Each structure stands twice: as structure tokens, then as C-alpha cells.
Amino acid sequence: MNLSLSDLHRQVSRLVQQESGDCTGKLRGNVAANKETTFQGLTIASGARESEKVFAQTVLSHVANVVLTQEDTAKLLQSTVKHNLNNYDLRSVGNGNSVLVSLRSDQMTLQDAKVLLEAALRQESGARGHVSSHSHSALHAPGTPVREGLRSHLDPRTPPLPPRERPHTSGHHGAGEARATAPSTVSPYGPEARAELSSRLTTLRNTLAPATNDPRYLQACGGEKLNRFRDIQCCRQTAVRADLNANYIQVGNTRTIACQYPLQSQLESHFRMLAENRTPVLAVLASSSEIANQRFGMPDYFRQSGTYGSITVESKMTQQVGLGDGIMADMYTLTIREAGQKTISVPVVHVGNWPDQTAVSSEVTKALASLVDQTAETKRNMYESKGSSAVGDDSKLRPVIHCRAGVGRTAQLIGAMCMNDSRNSQLSVEDMVSQMRVQRNGIMVQKDEQLDVLIKLAEGQGRPLLNS
């Protein structure tokens, strides 16, 4: 039985009210909730049910060419944050609106389906009287061109999008133009593309802005201070420890831990995190002048030996490396000892003259990313040669990176490391920054200058700025 748009919406809305909207939908005649699990972004190959795929396909068949408002996309982004998975590729059509280009899995939550179906109903209602009777299969909002049918990997018969390694150069600002017009010659790295990227990332940042006692973010407990800055918080789902502002970050295939500069009260936990992670490199991007400023409360923990609770730390400087433009990296080795635990040695890369809320050049960023990657690889090889159980554990052997807040310089470096990894060749700048923001907080890549460096690195690789 093929459900009409109104029937599908009615059944989905009832289930959202009766069940959890986080359940995925399934369809065999009528819509039902898969109560056994919440959304995991599965495909048929990775464990999604055929009935889940049919549900997703059916919803998709009703939302082709549907224009999503900023409010619609904000609701989808809330789902992305909640599940730590982005299920949707959206394309801007101007004026803050978007269309759904593709679905990244064979599943869809009931709540997301409700958002999409309500957008379709709204557009259908608004289109009455504006389209002829023979065009009901391609309804579109007034003043908006009829766009190509929704491409979904669920339907192999539909034409594919252009390859990700060749950035899409048209269609982002085509509202009001006929489909037969010549292809746009707008540069994929020009002002229009940059403005669109900035707009999308700003929308995401606003969606992720923390409210008071926001359940999406880790909250301090036991009277201890958790965050250096009230607005720079730690995503609860990816938190490394309950007492640290530190997150597991995975951008494509690049896995790291991003954190704030530890508070004095957090040092024992911070060292324990470094040891348990078998940290292959600690990259400290906070400047020496910041550390020396007593008002900032930034303990000089990695350049000095000391005792922190039950943990004893020995620090030894090993070398200094020039990165270009006068930017220097001081190298240290931290030896962490705790009774009853293995002694752990952690290489440290400290960039002591990168000022807060600024960007170093793309050349310096590349050199720093390469130094951090090489240092980490050497240490990983050591653990592998010793048969360490940390090898193969995705939660361990991650570079730990922080500046002061852990969002600006930290994110610039993580983005560059991601682009250094050939396995991430299909990721756009939008992908990378969005994944960092969803997994830590909305301020990752804090300053425009830092985003500009990532854009320049992407342009040098022919990497797209925007999702297709």
C-alpha cells in the first residue's frame, strides 16, 4: 500500500506522540516504531532493517524538491547533535533555505520524518493555485525553480551527484533562474561560496549554543569548577571524563582528543587521561605569555616536574623545531608515574608563540600538523612493537590537543591534521568543521582567520568548501 503524504504524516505524528521520536520508523503497510533501538545511522549492509529502509524511502519520495526553512534545518541539526550523527546532506537554495540532497543511511527517526513531512505539507498547501494540474508530482514553492529529484543512495536509478573531489560550482544561488540557463561560473572558493559556508556554520553554532544547565553538555558536579569559560562547554556524549572539559573527536578517519587547558584542580585527572589514553603526542598551543599570566590560572604543568595527588610527573625538554614565520615548537617528554600503574611516556609539542584568537599561516599550520602526526606515529609504532592492548582500541592512542579554551587554535590544527590524512579526501571544509562542532561545541574554529586558513589548505588540495 502506497501511503499518501497526509496519511504518512498522520501515522508518523501519532507515533511521535505515543512513542519516542528518537525511534527509527519502519514500514510494512503502515508505519511502526522500531522500539528496540534508537537511531544509529545504519545502512542495510551494517544492520539496518529492510522495513526501516522502506520507511526512509517512502518519506524521501514525498520530500523531493521540498524547500526547508532555517527552522526546519535547525530541527534536523538538533537531531544531529542528539545522536552525534549527521544523516542529511543539504544544499542551500538561497535566502536561508535548503533542499535535502541525500540521506546518509537507511534509517530515519520518526521525529525527523515529522519535520520533513510537515515541510512537504506546508509546501503543498502553499503551491495550490500556483502550479498546473499536470505538475503535481513536482511541487515547488512560489518563485523557486523546480529542482532535480532527490538523490538518495537508497534509489540507485537516480543520477549521482558530482564527485566530492570536484567541488559543486552551481545551484547554490539559483533561485528564480530557469533550469535551462548556462552553468554558473562562480568559483567554488570565491566570496559566494565562503559566504554560504559562513552562513551554514553560523546556523550550526547558534543551534549548539548552550542554555543554562543544558543537558547536551557536561555539567559540573560536587562543587568543582569544570569549564574555563561559561560559553565554551563540553559535549556530554563525547566527554572523555566527567571531571574534564575534554572530548573525543573523530573527523572522518582522524581521531583526536580536544580539551581546554586544564585548571589547577584538574591536573591529576588530566594526567590520568594522558596515561590511560597512552597519548602518542600532547600538542599544547597556548602561548608562553598566556601561561605566565597569573590572571589566567594556567599551571605550567608540562614544562616542569611535579606531584599531583597520587601522580608524579617528570618533564624533560628534548629539542626545538622551527615551523616557519618565526613560529617555534618546543619538544618535551613527560614521564607519568602512579603506584600500581604502568609508567607512561608522553611526547609534548608546545607552540609557545601563537597568540590566542589568531591564526598562523597555512604553511605553518601544515608544518605543525606534520610534526604532530609524525610524533604520534612514532609513538604508536612503539606501542605496536610492544604488543600493547591500546593498539586497535579506537578510544586510545589519540593525540591530545589543547590551547587555552580548546576551540580556536586547537580546531585549526585538527582540521589541518584531517586534511593531511588521505583517507579523508572526500570531506569538505563544512564536513570537518561541522563534525568538530557537533562533537565538542559550536565554537570550534572560533575565528574567521582560522577558518580562512582551513579554506586555503582545502583550495590547495582541490577539496570542496561545501557539502554537495
Curated annotation (Swiss-Prot):
Sorted alphabetically, the Gene Ontology cellular component annotations on this record are: extracellular region
Q: Does the keyword Hydrolase apply?
A: yes
Gene3D superfamilies to which the protein is assigned, alphabetical: Protein tyrosine phosphatase superfamily (3.90.190.10), Protein-tyrosine phosphatase, YopH, N-terminal domain (3.30.1570.10)
Q: Which InterPro entries match?
A: Prot-tyrosine_phosphatase-like, Protein-Tyr_Phosphatase, ProtTyrPase_YopH_N, ProtTyrPase_YopH_N_sf, PTP_cat, Tyr_Pase_AS, Tyr_Pase_cat, Tyr_Pase_dom
Query: Induction of this protein: by what?
Result: At 37 degrees Celsius in the absence of calcium.
Give the UniProt subcellular location, in the record's own words.
Answer: Secreted
User: Where is region (Disordered) located?
Assistant: 127-194
Q: Does the keyword Nucleotide-binding apply?
A: no
**GO molecular function list:** protein tyrosine phosphatase activity
The protein's matches in PROSITE patterns, at most eight in alphabetical order, are given as: TYR_PHOSPHATASE_1 (PS00383), TYR_PHOSPHATASE_2 (PS50056), TYR_PHOSPHATASE_PTP (PS50055)
Tell me the active site: 403
Query: Where do Low complexity bias regions lie?
Result: 130-141
Name the principal localization, coarsely classed. secreted
Q: Provide the reaction this enzyme catalyses.
A: O-phospho-L-tyrosyl-[protein] + H2O = L-tyrosyl-[protein] + phosphate
According to the entry, every stretch annotated as the Tyrosine-protein phosphatase domain falls at: 152-461
Task: Keywords in alphabetical order, please.
Answer: Hydrolase, Plasmid, Protein phosphatase, Secreted, Virulence
SUPFAM superfamilies (alphabetical) = (Phosphotyrosine protein) phosphatases II, YopH tyrosine phosphatase N-terminal domain
Known outcome of mutating residue 403 to A: Abolishes PTPase activity and significantly reduces the virulence
Biological role: Essential virulence determinant. This protein is a protein tyrosine phosphatase. The essential function of YopH in Yersinia pathogenesis is host-protein dephosphorylation. It contributes to the ability of the bacteria to resist phagocytosis by peritoneal macrophages.
Which family, according to the similarity comment?
Belongs to the protein-tyrosine phosphatase family. Non-receptor class subfamily.
For this entry, the protein name equals Tyrosine-protein phosphatase YopH
Source organism (scientific name): Yersinia pseudotuberculosis serotype I (strain IP32953)
